[in-house]
Amino acid sequence: MSDPKKLFIKTYGCQMNVYDSERMAEALGGQGYVETQSAEDADMILLNTCHIREKAAEKVYSELGRFKGLKAAKPDLKIGVAGCVAQAEGEEIMRRQPLVDLVVGPQSYHRLPELEAKTRAGEKALDTDFPEEDKFEKLKGRPKAKRGPTAFLTVQEGCDKFCAFCVVPYTRGAEVSRPADRILREANELVERGVREITLLGQNVNAYHGAGPNGDMTLAGLIWELDKIDGLERIRFTTSHPNDMADDLIEAHGTCAKLMPYLHLPVQAGSDKILKRMNRSHTAESYLRLIERIRAARPDIVMSGDFIVGFPEETEADFQDTLDLVEQVRYGYAYSFKYSTRPGTPAAERAQVDPAEADDRLQRLQAVITRHQREIQDGMVGREVSVLFEKPGRQPGQMVGKSEYLHAVHVQDPGLEAGQIARVRIVASGANSLAGELA
């Protein structure tokens, strides 16, 4: 019996890419591939790329350049580029880096087995179509092997919002929701493999409207169906748009015990002028009122957000509006970035903010966000939380997991196991984690 072929996947970017990489590995598993953590040992290398940040494509080309020596030493090595850079660049990747054998977009990776076979026949393989067929239906069921206690599950892809800074509608396409029965089937398969927490993924996940037994189902309806699965203890979802935060979803945060008290709800800016230029279709005031309604339903919920500073035409007054919004919301987590020009997006054509000024604003914003994060984490000391333990910590006998609020918690107890959920009393707060002891 011949040795299995080895597959090395490097994943960039969002949680959806992590999910996609898992499914690509499973698809190629049927071709005799097993995963390796070493590119040097691989028979196939796949870069699953992200196109959100500035110079994303150039970073991919630079990474590919590092494989030239490896390809020369192993002529049978196959190198592929997947994900959103593959979708955006297409055939240009092969032109600039002839060592690449395969380019596949995020809507076509269910075709990887036939594309891989094409490369083994000595041909180049390119597929960046938006096929009519459902890629999830074409993918086989999840393997039965045991896995960790948490998992991502994509329920929705694409976006119809067309924010002025974003390439997602161009690389992931229009909003598409998976039928509820297929999601529930996959969730059950994951639970059978030991998963106790599932995070539902979508570029605009709360716009979910997948087919259900009685017509389209909302995200809240899907969450309630997942709530019925024995063995599934926790549900999360990300990423959401404020305009799609429906009443039934807000209500679910207050009534569904398995839905964790954590919500990532990006706002991007606190200035109505900038929000309009971003094509966000909401105001700072409407966002703040939405936060009030969510907290009325679940008072202990921890909010998370995204911010872009230095957006074209942003003034100091606009930036102060963003700081004011952050002070009012007090995020437990927030991701902040300096605006980077994305060719092909409307914002790229507008007057740009001085880079030094944008850098200064980013530092000031991050200082406020960090202060709030530390205050919220310090406020956990003395409280009891529920922790799902995921893996051993750095110290002997230590286990690390996540609280319901997504805080990393480490506990010194040799009797704990991955997948166990326990009540923990928080005794100390650090920069990035909490220390606790079994309650």
Swiss-Prot record:
State the EC number(s).
Answer: 2.8.4.3
Where in or outside the cell is it found?
A: Cytoplasm
Major subcellular location class: cytoplasm
Q: Which GO terms describe its cellular component?
A: cytosol
Any Pfam family hit: TRAM
Domain TRAM: from-to ranges: 378-439
- Give start and end of each MTTase N-terminal domain: 5-121
Q: Which reaction does it catalyse?
A: N(6)-dimethylallyladenosine(37) in tRNA + (sulfur carrier)-SH + AH2 + 2 S-adenosyl-L-methionine = 2-methylsulfanyl-N(6)-dimethylallyladenosine(37) in tRNA + (sulfur carrier)-H + 5'-deoxyadenosine + L-methionine + A + S-adenosyl-L-homocysteine + 2 H(+)
Q: Where is the Radical SAM core domain?
A: 145-378
Protein origin, superkingdom: Bacteria
Q: How does it assemble?
A: Monomer.
Q: Which PANTHER family does its entry note?
A: CDK5 REGULATORY SUBUNIT-ASSOCIATED PROTEIN 1 (PTHR43020), MITOCHONDRIAL TRNA METHYLTHIOTRANSFERASE CDK5RAP1 (PTHR43020:SF2)
What's the family?
Answer: Belongs to the methylthiotransferase family. MiaB subfamily.
Q: This chain belongs to which protein, by name?
A: tRNA-2-methylthio-N(6)-dimethylallyladenosine synthase
Q: What is the protein's species of origin?
A: Ruegeria pomeroyi (strain ATCC 700808 / DSM 15171 / DSS-3)
Q: What gene is behind this protein? A: miaB
